[in-house]
């Protein structure tokens, strides 16, 4: 067990998010910073126009595209560690699958505005988005690699549909824009080494500024409608899998992709 094995997660269940302070050692933080920065440099080189025009995040860090095998191994060992198991397992009724990794950073344009959203709005209709609030869980585990402004949430929106204003803002309707202020928002700043758990379906927005560089690890209930977005090349090989303290989330995803024929 890790130091996080006895945490009360009632705050997450009630609000849809929960911050865990000072979760990892400075030495482990330094290792993850180096891996994330190496990925970012290589990813930026191949996505320069996108990065300079509007990007605020990248994805698929554990794929072989931008990291070498040693760097990928470091990420797999962290994701499959006792620490991550102790944080993630209590939030799922049975088991969970590994979905993806993302890296969040500041936009190049200092005038670029942040935006309220639910993650599911980019692939579901409004009716499907509303139904998703009682459906499978998609979970972000964010690790702040440096001090950052964090995120802003509408507490409880992981279980509650939008008010008229919230819907107008996040969908740019009725003269609103997704960067407009919303009443009831809760700011959650992060310090380096903090973790932040939040439901992907809740209304939230990232806050830009400072030295924002955050590693997100996404987990979900083991259902095809969510794991269809996972990629086989982002999973560890058999040798690495057998070395992990907690290989379960990777194994669940590998089996689901195999059964669905998704390569």
Q: What residues fall within each predicted segment?
A:
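Non-heme Fe(II)-dependent double-stranded beta-helix
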Residues: 2-14, 21-127
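Non-heme Fe(II)/2-oxoglutarate
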Residues: 7, 48, 195, 201-263
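Double-stranded beta-helix
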Residues: 10, 134, 138, 144-203
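A structural signal for short, well-ordered beta-strand segments
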Residues: 101-103, 141-143, 215-219
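Short edge-strand/loop segments of extracellular domains
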Residues: 106, 158-161, 219-225
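Short, charged/polar surface micro-motifs in flexible loops or helix N-caps
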Residues: 108-111, 121, 146-148, 195, ...
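A short secondary-structure junction signal
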Residues: 111-118, 125-128, 150-157, 162-166, ...
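Active-site glycine-rich loop that binds ribose-phosphate moieties when present
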Residues: 120-129, 173-175, 181
